[in-house]
Amino acid sequence: MVFLPLKWSLATMSFLLSSLLALLTVSTPSWCQSTEASPKRSDGTPFPWNKIRLPEYVIPVHYDLLIHANLTTLTFWGTTKVEITASQPTSTIILHSHHLQISRATLRKGAGERLSEEPLQVLEHPRQEQIALLAPEPLLVGLPYTVVIHYAGNLSETFHGFYKSTYRTKEGELRILASTQFEPTAARMAFPCFDEPAFKASFSIKIRREPRHLAISNMPLVKSVTVAEGLIEDHFDVTVKMSTYLVAFIISDFESVSKITKSGVKVSVYAVPDKINQADYALDAAVTLLEFYEDYFSIPYPLPKQDLAAIPDFQSGAMENWGLTTYRESALLFDAEKSSASSKLGITMTVAHELAHQWFGNLVTMEWWNDLWLNEGFAKFMEFVSVSVTHPELKVGDYFFGKCFDAMEVDALNSSHPVSTPVENPAQIREMFDDVSYDKGACILNMLREYLSADAFKSGIVQYLQKHSYKNTKNEDLWDSMASICPTDGVKGMDGFCSRSQHSSSSSHWHQEGVDVKTMMNTWTLQKGFPLITITVRGRNVHMKQEHYMKGSDGAPDTGYLWHVPLTFITSKSDMVHRFLLKTKTDVLILPEEVEWIKFNVGMNGYYIVHYEDDGWDSLTGLLKGTHTAVSSNDRASLINNAFQLVSIGKLSIEKALDLSLYLKHETEIMPVFQGLNELIPMYKLMEKRDMNEVETQFKAFLIRLLRDLIDKQTWTDEGSVSERMLRSQLLLLACVHNYQPCVQRAEGYFRKWKESNGNLSLPVDVTLAVFAVGAQSTEGWDFLYSKYQFSLSSTEKSQIEFALCRTQNKEKLQWLLDESFKGDKIKTQEFPQILTLIGRNPVGYPLAWQFLRKNWNKLVQKFELGSSSIAHMVMGTTNQFSTRTRLEEVKGFFSSLKENGSQLRCVQQTIETIEENIGWMDKNFDKIRVWLQSEKLERM
């Protein structure tokens, strides 16, 4: 599943632009072990099970599902037939059911003339989302039984389970469809089932529908028959063995376009009829990517078809249901005339992510949600591996390390968690869908590939997939597969891989020791956080020290953590990558000669940050100001990031970090510029929350002066590579938002002409965001933009307008946006988390956003689910730029009052830590920034 993280942009679905858009706009509930008595029937029969996890002695083998949804009454009924076996005698069958009305349950045994069917007594435990079926006599070990359950339910008004979605045609007609979103624990909302990933089974699915509708599911349609009342019953082929959360079905009036891969797999994209002309790009990308994965994994895609469906109402970014992946429209549909370059990048990466899941996650699935990263970390990592080959023009490899910085931002907090961490209840499970599971997971895999070599790493994961196909795995299963490729005894592994002699190194450490992958990677998956590596150069001796990097403390936290850190470095004397495996707290390596500078973590391929003691930072700052291209753009971006992260823990002064940033005046590459903005913009956002207007204004002016030359070079066109176009879009937006008059005047001219054409003038896509942001500042412009928003068929255009509308300084209009997006009539509720956060970043809007969150909390967690990434996004988006003690006390007071309805959410702990960090940071650095802004070096800019 692609979740939409805190730093998101629905306008682009791009991991790159997300953080900048947000910046420019201006543990868990305690119900996993219930203390209340188990529920009882009216006759006093108690519920026979008191754990969240299901017992393991009843095993599902095959499901036969019949579901009929009425899109007029918004209800559905169904029959679930589950073939089961028992591994021990039992008269109790425990499975999941949530918000379903069970009308009858029976147990079938035997076959032919000896077939018998007995009624089962049904007990419900709503709090645990379980039902118990009590048989009149114990089930016998090894014999086949079939449980038959008749039930009914209402189509969900949320974004999970079997839920209602709507859209309007060009003519304004409202149409209704029904779709599913089961991951992680919502299959139980559509049919009673053993809703845990380890209970894999096959599925036969039948859907009843009206003739005017179309039904699709995981497998191809086998036949359709007419049944009572003129309804059509679609029978779909039997699935492969899979987890319940991967089941999917959609009843709609969608249309589709299709192509066939080289291996004969039919790939189709489904969308509402008015938008099917936007499906071609995703279709071509899906075909290419599916073919790539079949070749890379050396395992054929096991299903005969792969559908991709754009759902009008969708909470996350996308979902990997086997054979029927589902997406937000903005994550799948590409309008050649109006979609941005970053939208193309985002769509490509999202499709790559979901198709990677067809192997990582679907074919091989984590045993339990504590190892979710085995699914999501791999899928995130494979996005970059695949797209770098299938779409080289996108140059996605340059952007990978940005995901590591995103992960580090939350992993630096005490409230972070290990990549693999225990979870039990649904809210805890939902909280696992975060930057640590996705981005840190991907980053440590990339680090491992860099350490082992690409070929050895590939061989290891192919063996992992082949060995565990249609099964479930734990952390150690992956390391065991890697270990078989790379033995720990120092002997060359399979096919000669893992021989360290293939790497040049100034150190014997890398050569002589065996590659103990499991021991090494356990330090990265079983410990939270990441190391700070401190480098001290004494002549030819390089002293290295590792400690746990954690914000909120000027000293290293006393966690006792040690990592096996595969260090890489280059020097002023050699651009060859040198390698050193640091397994102890301190170590020393000896260079062949003295050097002027040394740069560790080459290309940001390692998940750690580096501090250079003594004059180390001065040397690197001088290098950047003199010949910044002496190191790669990724290395330049990582230096910017590391410098400002060190300010947070008191290892480097804010003046030195700001001095380093001055080199950006000569920078032209996207990643260093974006990283510079990611570090500098939050500084004045913190000032906004303290009403420090004078210094805030000076800082914004400094930022524009710093990048003015690059801004002035931007053309108001759609020319150039994807990275050049994304850089243009963000620089022009930055300039216009900060009232840089050459930009504002040009944007005003474009907006005036666009408005005079009634929105028919074709604007350059790359400048549209800046044009709309300027146009929305007037009441007339805002109203015109909203009128166009209502009827636009382009996801990119709608999101660009949405962004602009949230930029207004009119509080009444901001409040209206909050109210209407929450209602969902005029603006879809799926947009609400983004709108709330955009308004939370608006200097005049953030009090409105914070008040709205508090006032509507109970409704929000009902709609978006406690523990979901959407709830985390809203909590962090409305509060994590607060920088005063008054706001901190407000935040603490509100969330503590929620008790089990949110007080222990990880995002709440994160935002409290972040606000405390903001307060401390401002107290220590604000006066220094004020003085620095008046320094002579700035006068010479």
From Swiss-Prot:
Zn(2+) binds at residues 353, 357, 376. It is a single-pass type II membrane protein. Residues 22-941 are lumenal. Residues 1 are cytoplasmic. It comes from Homo sapiens (Human). It is an enzyme of class 3 (hydrolase). The keyword Zinc applies. Keywords: Adaptive immunity, Aminopeptidase, Disulfide bond, Endoplasmic reticulum, Glycoprotein, Hydrolase, Immunity, Membrane, Metal-binding, Metalloprotease, Protease, Signal-anchor, Transmembrane, Transmembrane helix, Zinc. Ubiquitous. Its cofactor is Zn(2+). Disulfide bonds join 404-443, 736-743. The active site is at residue 354. GO terms for molecular function: aminopeptidase activity; endopeptidase activity; interleukin-1, type II receptor binding; interleukin-6 receptor binding; metalloaminopeptidase activity; metalloexopeptidase activity; peptide binding; zinc ion binding. Changing residue 438 to F: Loss of enzyme activity. Its main location: endoplasmic reticulum. Its EC number is 3.4.11.-. The chain crosses the membrane at residues 2-21. One of its GO terms (biological process) is regulation of innate immune response. This is Endoplasmic reticulum aminopeptidase 1. Glycans are attached at residues 70, 154, 414, 760, 901. One of its GO terms (cellular component) is extracellular space. Induction: By IFNG/IFN-gamma. Belongs to the peptidase M1 family. The record marks 438 as: Transition state stabilizer.
